[in-house]
């Protein structure tokens, strides 16, 4: 079983990389938010618990997140790429317990600077119609301010301001530092300031050497 963990601050390119890398490796992608919504929609026992937590405004506990990860791993024997999970050392320890010594575990940390993150996210625009994400510097729409897919006017997220982005970046570094240390043995640190193509090329070279 191949298991890949993607860590990195908001704006480091995890989402885009997860899509490209999962297609290249032939593995499924686990995104915590998506898994929570799927559990709620399925109305499973786990989903009912998640729904109660979400509706009450409570953080979903580590045990529940790990149970979702375990279900996802069992459903995808071809391998799994975890995007933004684990978020705590407790979740990391739980994930390690789910992965056997024979499994192929890789942890990739996209190490991007505060300046790079701020530049990327202040340039980000989102389509409220179909959810497509653009970057006015690196991936602009064909028609200024309008989604290529559905012609909806693009918006800027309220939290994509420089002050909020810099604060989120510092919080992420504080929360992630223990994870980077925890996974020191498996960690592949990649320069997240590079373009998405170069980052993908570097990771593919490490995971799939010729």
Language-model region placement:
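Glycine-rich phosphate-binding loop of ATP-dependent small-molecule kinases
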Residues: 1-210
């Amino acid at each position: 079983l191949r298991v890949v963990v993607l860590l990195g601050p908001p704006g480091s390119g995890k989402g885009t990389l997860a899509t490209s890398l999962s297609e290249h490796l032939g593995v499924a992608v686990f995104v915590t938010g998506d898994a929570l919504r799927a559990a709620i929609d399925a109305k499973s026992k786990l989903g009912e618990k998640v729904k109660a937590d979400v509706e009450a405004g409570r953080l979903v506990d580590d045990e529940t997140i790990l149970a979702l990860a375990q279900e996802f791993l069992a459903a995808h024997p071809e391998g799994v790429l975890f995007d933004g999970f684990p978020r705590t050392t407790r979740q990391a320890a739980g994930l390690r317990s789910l992965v056997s010594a024979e499994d192929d575990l890789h942890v990739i940390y996209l190490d991007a600077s505060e300046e790079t993150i701020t530049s990327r996210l202040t340039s980000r625009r989102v389509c409220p119609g179909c959810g497509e994400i653009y970057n006015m510097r690196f991936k602009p729409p064909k028609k200024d301010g309008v989604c290529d897919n559905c012609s909806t006017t693009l918006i800027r997220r309220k939290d994509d301001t420089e002050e909020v982005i810099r604060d989120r970046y510092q919080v992420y570094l504080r929360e992630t530092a223990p994870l980077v240390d925890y996974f020191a043995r498996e960690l592949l640190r990649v320069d997240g300031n590079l373009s998405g193509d170069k980052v993908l090329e570097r990771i593919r070279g490490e995971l799939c050497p010729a």
